[in-house]
Amino acid sequence: MQNDSNKNTLMFLVCAFAILIGYQFLVMGPQQKQREAELRAKKAAEAQVAVQPGMTIGADGTPQPLKLSRDEAKAQSPRIAVDTPALSGSIALKGARIDDLWLKRYTQTADKNSPPVELFRPEGAEHAWFADFGWAGIAGMTGLPTPQTVWTAAPGQVLRPTTPVVLTYDNGQGLVFTRTISVDADAMFTVADTVRNQGGAAVALAPYASVQRQGIPTEGPHGLGKTQIVYEGGIGVLGGIDGVEGGKYILQNKAKYPKWKKDKPLQDNLQSKGGWIGMTDKYWLAALVPQQSEMIKGRFQVKPVSGVDVYESAFTGAPKSLAAGATVTNTTRLFAGAKTVPLLTRYQYGGKPVVWWEFWNRPANVIPNFDKAVDWGMFEVITRPIFNVLEIFYKMVGNFGVAIMLLTVALKLILFPLADKSYESMAKMKKIAPEVEKLKVKNKDDPAKQQQEMMALYAKEKINPMMGCVPMLIQIPIFYSLYKVLTVTIEMRHAPFFGWITDLSARDPSTFMNLFGLIHWDPATAPLIGAFLSGPLHIGVWPLLYGFTMWLTTAMNPPAGDPIQQKIFQFFPIVFTFTLSQFAVGLVIYWCWSNVLTILQQYIIMHRYKVDNPIDQLVNRLRGKTVEAT
C-alpha cells in the first residue's frame, strides 16, 4: 500500500512538473516576448523626437550612439603598428592612445583555427576599451593635448620590443610634448611623457593615466559580471602611505560589474604612493602602474555618456611646476595582457626569481601585490598552494587533467591518517547496524533510553559516529579552492584532457540528449525547449560517472537511522549529477577520481573488518553465475 502511495505521489510530481514547464514555454514565454516587443516599440516611438544625427535606437528603445565597425573605428585615426611576440595591433595618433590590441598567444575558442583574443578596441566601436595618458592643466591652463589632438610621428615606425616609437605635439603656445612608447616581449608598455616649456612663463600641470571601457558586454560567452565566483571590474592595489592603514597597500575591489554602477559609481581621491590601478576580466587585465615613488589619487568611476555607461579606472599624479626653459618627464607603465601567474609574479618582483613556498625569502615588491589581479578567493591560503602544486605536476606530465588526478592522490595521501580513522569508524558502524536497528525497535517509545543505549554501544565498540563527517568537511574548502583555480586561472583555459575534453575550465561538452554525439543533433536547436535541453539537462559522460561513483560511495556508508533521511541520501547522487553537470569538467574529474580512491580505501577497510559491502556482493553474484554456468 505504501509503495502504491509513493508511486502515485511520484507520478503526480512528474505530471505537475511537465505541466509547469509546458505552460512556461508555450504560454508564459510567448506572452512575455510580446510584452517586451510592445514596450520596445513604445519606447522607440517616444524616443524618435530625441534622435540626433549620429544616433540610433537601441534594443531597449532608447537613443544611443551609432556604433562603428572595428575597422571603421580604426580608420578614424592614422596609426602606428604594434608587433611583439605576444601582441599585435596599433596605436592611434589621434589622442596618442593605445586602443587596438590582440593577444597572439590566446585564441577565442579551443579551436586551433580560432582568431586571437581581442583586448583593446577603438573608441566608436561597440564596447570600446583603451588606455589614455596625458597632462591635466592646473588653474585653468589651456593648450594641452586632448583626445582629439593628432600627434606626429616619423613615417614607417613600428612598435617592437627593440624599437620604441616617438610621438610629438607642439601646441604653438610654447609647450612641446613628446611621448616615447616602448614595450617588452610580453605585456608591459612603458609610456614616457616629456614636456618642454619654450615659453616665457612658468606653467603647472599634473600627469594622469586612464583605462576606459565604453559599455561592457553582458551576454554571450564574453559577457561580464554574470557570476559571483569571479571578480570582474575596476581593480587596484593602493596605499603605502605612512600613518594610513599602517602604511599597507590595500586591494581595491569594490567596483565589480554590474554593482559598480549601482552601489559605488564614483570612488575618488584614493590616495596612494605608487601602487597600480586598472580593470580586469576573468582572464585579462589592463593595469596602470605609476612611478612607485610618486603620490597619486586613484579613481573608479562609471557615468552615462550619450546613452552608454562609461567605466573608468584612472589616477592623477602630483602637480608639477615647469619653469620657462625647463623640461619635466613622467613615466607610466601599462600592463595589457593575460593574467598568467608567473608573468604577474615576475613583474611584481622586478624579474627576480621567486620560489613560491619560500615566503620568508621574497624579494622586494616592484609593483605592490600585482599577483592580486588574480581572484584567489577567500581560501587563498589553500587556493594558491593548490595551483602551485598543479603547475608542478603539469610540468611533470604535460596535461592538466592528469595533474588534477595526481593532485587528488597527493591530497588523499596527506589526509590518509585522518580519513583512515574516519572510514574505519564508518565500517564499524555499518557492521553494528543490525544491533542499532534492534535497539531502535526495542526502545521505540523511549527516545532518551534509545539514545543512551546507542551511545553505550558506540563506546563499547570504540566508535565515534561523528568521524564519518570529517573527510567531507575537510574537502569543502579544497573543493572550493580547486573550483577557483579552474575558474579564474588562465592556465586552465582551453587546457585539454583526453578524448572529447578540450577545455578543463568548461563543462563536459557531451550530453546524453544526443547519445553523447552518436546522433548528430544539437539539443540547443530544439524549438521552445532548446535552452532547457542544453542547460539543466545537458549531462555529459563525466557527470554520469561522478553520479555512479557517488552512489557507490553512499552504498558503502552505514545507512541513516531515519527512513526519510535514507530516501534523501538515495536522491543525492541524482541531484549532484545534475548540479555538477554545469561545473567545469576539471572539477568533475577531480571529484570522480576522488570518489574512486575513497571507494577503494573504504573497500580495503571493510574487507579487513569483514563488513558486507556492494563490491563483495557484486563479486559473489558474478562467482555464483560462473559456478551455475559450469
From Swiss-Prot:
Top-rank taxon, per record: Bacteria
Coiled-coil regions listed: none
Transmembrane domains' residue ranges: 10-30, 396-416, 470-490, 528-548, 571-591
InterPro entries recorded: Membr_insert_YidC, Membr_insert_YidC_N, YidC/ALB3/OXA1/COX18, YidC/Oxa/ALB_C, YidC_ALB_C, YidC_periplasmic_sf
Location(s) in or outside the cell: Cell inner membrane
Topology relative to the membrane: Multi-pass membrane protein
Any one Gene Ontology BP term: protein transport
GO cellular component: plasma membrane
Keywords: Cell inner membrane, Cell membrane, Chaperone, Membrane, Protein transport, Transmembrane, Transmembrane helix, Transport
Range of residues in the leader sequence: none
Main location: membrane
GO MF: membrane insertase activity
Oligomeric form and interacting partners: Interacts with the Sec translocase complex via SecD. Specifically interacts with transmembrane segments of nascent integral membrane proteins during membrane integration.
Family of the protein in this entry: Belongs to the OXA1/ALB3/YidC family. Type 1 subfamily.
PANTHER family: CYTOCHROME C OXIDASE ASSEMBLY PROTEIN COX18, MITOCHONDRIAL, OXA1
Function, as annotated: Required for the insertion and/or proper folding and/or complex formation of integral membrane proteins into the membrane. Involved in integration of membrane proteins that insert both dependently and independently of the Sec translocase complex, as well as at least some lipoproteins. Aids folding of multispanning membrane proteins.
Protein name: Membrane protein insertase YidC
Organism: Caulobacter sp. (strain K31)
The gene coding this protein: yidC
